Amino acid sequence: MVLIPMGRPEPTTIKNKMTKKKIKINTRAKREIDRYPLVAVYWLDICSDASWQSIESSKKSKLPTCVTKGHLLSQKGGITRIFGDYSLADEESGKIDEIGNTTIIPNSVIVEIKKIS
């Protein structure tokens, strides 16, 4: 019989630049859409593999970095919210009626956020 020690696994450290990375929302913009900057969010995703592989090969596996682009809605409560589409209630004033194609990303998996000009 082989005994496997129980307890906490070895910690895996992933550097996360998100701790102090926030992008401000321009609440004073005349057109509502201009309040929400266009951004690219780089984040780490979960990866699974059902194939047979060696332990060493599995230990060398890396998390994939994904990129989501859209308008930054908010960064509160450990969550970054993005939307890709919107409909205008009034085109002249730029008032937004509804948003769509929304993505909610936990800040703990975000590596970087870049503002798109």
Predicted regions and their residues:
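Short, positively charged low-complexity motifs
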Residues: 1-10
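Conserved RNA-binding domains used in RNP assembly and mRNA/RNA metabolism
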Residues: 13-117
